[in-house]
Amino acid sequence: MRTRSRSTVRPLWPPPSPARFATWSHYRLRDHGDHTRPVDPRSAGTQVDDEVLEERVAYNLSKDAQLKEEARINVVAYNGKVLLIGQAPTMSASESAKNLAAGAEGVTEIYNEIRTGEKIGVGQISIDSWITTAIKSKLLANSEVKATEVKVITENGEVFLIGKLSPAQADAAAEVARNVRGVNKVIKVINYVQ
């Protein structure tokens, strides 16, 4: 059996050109001043609190056997507010998930966006991931909204924009999202600021 040496193995795709990195850096530096990495507008403590809150809600949801078996629910927390997205077999299962989430310590508000229906498959999950990436990339190039100020989540072609924005910024972010191929609906879960 003949083997190839490591030096002859080629990558699956060519690495990005240096011009792409220059463009990426241009957007990051323009959007974030001197920073060399994106900065979440929430404090580090709030980010940790939100991560802990997501775990608490997910734990509460895992206690329900029907939800665990038949539903696909993702939990997103932002400043103590919880967004539930995914699919559940019945409307009562969706309401049950909302009630379980409300029982988690630290929840200030719940947005229940769980849809009634079959769980989505790996193909749709991949498409949703692509949509989220495309929107985030376009937000980096947008001068009206900083990409770090809005969290983008896609579930079954529905895009959820989460963050603390002015009405004009929220509208600009929604317009960016609407113009990405594969987006069926844009839902703003925004804390409005002036």
Swiss-Prot record:
Main location: periplasm
Repeat listed as a keyword: yes
InterPro entries: BON_dom (IPR007055), Lipoprotein_DolP (IPR051686), Transpt-assoc_nodulatn_dom_bac (IPR014004)
Signal peptide: 1-19
Lineage: superkingdom: Bacteria
Pfam families per the UniProt record, alphabetical: BON
Compartments where located: Periplasm
Matching Gene3D superfamilies: 3.30.1340.30
CC terms in the record's Gene Ontology section: periplasmic space
Entry's Gene Ontology BP terms: killing of cells of another organism
Protein name: 21 kDa hemolysin
Organism: Actinobacillus pleuropneumoniae
Organism classification: Bacteria, Pseudomonadati, Pseudomonadota, Gammaproteobacteria, Pasteurellales
Gene name per UniProt: hly
